[in-house]
Amino acid sequence: QFFAIDYFNKVIRLACLLHDSGHSSFSHQFTRVSTIKKMMSDPDLFKKLWGNITVGELYKSSPVVIEHEHYSIRCAYQILLDTDVLASGINPIDVLSIMETTSSTPSDLFCEHAKHFWEFIVGETNESAPTLVRELLSSIISGEVDADRADYMLRDGFHSSVTIGGFNLDHLLSNLRFGWAPNEPWLGLAVTSKGLSALEDFVYSRYQMYRHVYAHKTALGFDWLLREAINEVLEDQSISEYVQLCLTDLNEFRHLTDNYFWECFRNYSRKNPASYSYCIINRIKLKHIDTQLNLSAEQVDSNKGLLAKKLNIPLEEVVTCTMNARFSKIRENFNEMRVLVKDPISHQHELKLITEVSSFFNKFTDGTITHFYKKPSILVS
């Protein structure tokens, strides 16, 4: 059982370290660039990325749309292969199997350790143990309360000098348990009733970070300028061809960094002062003129026209940026995580759905934030 715990500890730490290794330049903004989207919609891109490597163990079929998570799997595969983690007693397929997008079956070693791990938690054997343990580990990598969110919320709150992203991580972690409901069967993370308030703080803090930091008018405005600047420099055939090469060749993909595009922006802005690249290099921001919540696409267009009329400017000078402010997946039938409740009379513990214990998660809903801007005069002229 000790060796099983040690093995899963190493597997999950490796998965946490590698799960975002497929992010390219400027993280999520890169894959939102319209020209990049077209490149990544190439039906042969997945096959080109993997070359002669057999991926049957990882994917049952080639994905229709390539996302950064697919690049993370490709990068993680190569890193684990090059560092020869197999010689250290860790099967790379086990690390990849708990990361997003894969549909792989864990190794025999994983299954053996899962059985011992299961006996440690439950005290008896179960044929479904490998599957249930893999799903449990996957939820820690990518779930409603995962390692990534716990990390970036505190980090982003600190570096943006705000307190709204704060929550008591130590209290939350100390009140997390393994939950096991044998009648279903269900295995997953459970939070004690004492730690439920920390979970509520965690979810609400993330919601507030999206509303006030990630969807801040200045942040979204520069995100828009950045995407347009990337589109702009990709009009150069040599740059476009190199980026396409990077998206299919892992040796080149590692060179597709922020610095690469910053140099492209500098070169382009010297020759073209009335450009998005010039705005990015010289920190010329969009002029914010309005913010609206939860607008439909038709309402966005309508408000855009009204603003253009009020300001007496052409419609094309008004720019919009929209971000989804997702509150939480925790709703009435949410089953990925439960609450461990102690009966005050029998003193027996039982697992309940989070919404059966807390009404907090029904008080908020997902929404959208749309900012409206006027283009800088340098772009208009």
What is each stretch, according to the model?
Residues 1-14, 22-290:
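Sequence-structural signature of the catalytic-core scaffold of metal-dependent phosphohydrolases
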